[in-house]
From Swiss-Prot:
InterPro entries: EF-G-like_DII, EFG_III/V, G_TR_CS, P-loop_NTPase, PrfC, RF3_C, RF3_dom_3_sf, RF3_GTP-bd. The gene is prfC. The keyword RNA-binding does not apply. HAMAP family: Rel_fac_3. Belongs to the TRAFAC class translation factor GTPase superfamily. Classic translation factor GTPase family. PrfC subfamily. Keywords: Cytoplasm, GTP-binding, Nucleotide-binding, Protein biosynthesis. Residues 11-280 form the tr-type G domain. Increases the formation of ribosomal termination complexes and stimulates activities of RF-1 and RF-2. It binds guanine nucleotides and has strong preference for UGA stop codons. It may interact directly with the ribosome. The stimulation of RF-1 and RF-2 is significantly reduced by GTP and GDP, but not by GMP. This is Peptide chain release factor 3. The keyword GTP-binding applies. GO terms for biological process: regulation of translational termination. It comes from Serratia proteamaculans (strain 568). PANTHER family: PEPTIDE CHAIN RELEASE FACTOR RF3. GO terms for cellular component: cytosol. GTP binds at residues 20-27, 88-92, 142-145.
Length: 529
């Protein structure tokens, strides 16, 4: 392949994730994005939770029952001249770790806001995460077919609470039953709303010009007058779109629409492919790696167990950073120093998998994993480097787990270790007892683990409360002091799923006193994978 062909493939890629509060319409938008990219012909509506048409990206048993996305799926689809990789992140408020790691693998995010509610708690948390890497953000104000808050007010709230400037690209005409469409500020065109449900994309009627009498006839004189008045205000009070400010994460273009009504999503996608960055450089332990480099490199940001109930398998999701993956190529797994031939990498269309012949920077490929790959692993064509910035968080909630059938201890341990490797939960094995303690960032993770142990490993487990309030990973360069610490604190020490030593504290007071007593020991709240 010639360098110019390779450069063209790289420049076509856009890799993004959707962030939102639960129920802001993220799953619907995911489907409609795929629909506009023609990847799904029938966008199975999520509201029909009793029907068999589950949302294309919610494919695990518990997700199917609840209608929330618990695991990250990956979908690739063509749009205009580009190839778009969409990473679906869990929408439920609990799943911050998995979501966080997914956000390390994208170059851009789409923030979905319920225009009736404005900025909500989960959106704030996710925006904090994107801030750490200055990820560019596009915004979609959703649910315009319902009664919403004043759009100016919602934009002000975004600017105030999320500390990002808003630049409206489209502007709504009415809302709820009176929703008539949107006006595009940069094209001077009005797109008239016709509801399109499911997988029908309606032909949209376009009215050119703001002073066109056709506009008054189409939306009514009152709404047309209101639109002109609002636009004067908007153009005076809001920011003009500035591509540099967008790329540095300081400004977000804002689009209005209704995902359920298949309206406005294409305007946002047009903005995404026009403005979002092609695959970005990434920092490694030794240098910055640029997408256009000839040699392949990539990192694993997620491990998913049992994606195919028919095959007991685990798949490691790898973001390609540089070079080109070709079927059958030999790659070095840097952590182990082993060279492996990868002949059966997968690409995904949410649950439908197919084998990949080639992949480029920005693409996500799946590697079959028989317990040898971990989150954070770097693969190269021989270079000894590790991509940085893929963290593990100290859990905030803890339970002791025990079996209904004590003879299944081996299966329980296997299941927990596999679930901890994919980041669904963290497992701690206290050194001084045979207990198994499970740590999570949110309550729902505990339910997920018990449900998956039962459905995937045939193990029935129960939780009991345990006297642990927090955990820290510990290390110390002074061997003698560390031995003394380990001897005296044995009752509070445990090994996590990766056999890293951690201190489990019954109270924050206990942790603070221990830290004061052993100043040479480092207590870490996060750990690089």
């Amino acid at each position: 392949m010639s360098p110019s062909e390779f450069a063209r493939e790289v420049s076509k890629r856009r890799t993004f994730a959707i962030i939102s509060h639960p129920d802001a319409g993220k799953t619907t938008i995911t489907e409609k994005v795929l629909l506009f990219g023609q990847a799904i012909q029938t966008a199975g509506t999520v509201k029909g939770r009793g029907s068999n048409q589950h949302a294309k990206s919610d494919w695990m048993e518990m997700e199917k029952q609840r209608g929330i996305s618990i695991t990250t799926s990956v979908m690739q689809f063509p749009y205009r001249e580009c190839l778009v990789n969409l990473l679906d992140t869990p929408g439920h408020e609990d799943f911050s770790e998995d979501t966080y790691r997914t956000l390390t693998a994208v170059d851009c995010c789409l923030m979905v806001i319920d225009a009736a509610k404005g900025v909500e708690d989960r959106t704030r948390k996710l925006m904090e995460v994107t801030r750490l890497r200055d990820t560019p953000i596009l915004t979609f104000m959703n649910k315009l077919d319902r009664d919403i808050r004043d759009p100016m007010e919602v934009m002000d709230e975004v600017e105030r609470e999320l500390k990002i400037a808003c630049s409206p690209i489209t502007w709504p005409i009415g809302c709820g039953k009176l929703f008539k469409g949107v006006y595009h500020l940069y094209k001077d065109e009005t797109y008239l709303y016709q509801t399109g449900k499911g997988h029908t994309i309606q032909e949209v009627r376009i009215v050119k010009g703001l002073d066109n009498p056709e506009l008054d006839a189409a939306v009514g004189e009152d709404l047309a007058a209101q639109l002109r008045e609002e636009l004067e205000l908007v153009q005076g009070a809001s920011h003009e779109f500035d591509h540099e400010a967008f790329l540095s994460g300081d400004l977000t273009p804002v689009f209005f629409g209704t995902a359920l009504g298949n309206f406005g999503v294409d305007h946002m996608l047009d903005g995404l492919v026009a403005w979002a960055p092609a695959p970005m450089p990434r920092q490694s332990s030794t240098r910055e790696v640029v997408a256009a480099e000839e040699k392949f490199s990539g990192f694993v940001f997620k491990i998913q167990a049992n994606m195919d109930p028919k095959h007991r398998d685990r798949v490691a999701f790898m973001r390609v950073v540089s070079g080109r993956y070709e079927k059958g190529m030999k790659l070095r797994q840097v952590r182990t120093g082993k060279d492996v031939v990868i002949s059966d990498a997968l690409t995904f269309m949410a649950g439908d998998r197919s084998h990949v012949e080639e992949a480029y920077p920005g693409d996500i490929i799946g590697l079959h994993n028989h317990g040898t790959i971990q989150i954070g692993d770097t693969f190269t064509q021989g270079e000894d480097m590790k991509f940085t910035g893929i963290p593990n968080f100290a859990p905030e909630l803890f339970r002791r787990i025990r079996l209904r059938d004590p003879l299944k201890q081996k299966q329980l341990l296997k299941g927990l270790v596999q679930l901890s490797e994919e980041g669904a939960v963290q497992v701690f094995r206290p050194i001084a007892s045979n207990d198994l303690i499970v740590g999570a960032v949110g309550v729902l993770q505990f339910e997920v683990v018990v449900a998956r142990l039962k459905s995937e490993y045939n193990v029935e487990a129960l939780y009991e409360s345990v006297n642990v309030s927090t955990a820290r990973w510990v290390e110390c360069s002074d061997v003698k002091k560390f031995e003394e610490f380990k001897r005296k604190c044995e009752l509070n020490l445990a090994l996590d799923g990766g056999d890293n030593l951690s201190y489990i504290a019954p109270t924050m007071v206990n942790l603070n006193i221990t830290q004061e007593r052993y100043p040479e020991v480092v207590f870490r709240k996060t750990r690089e994978h």
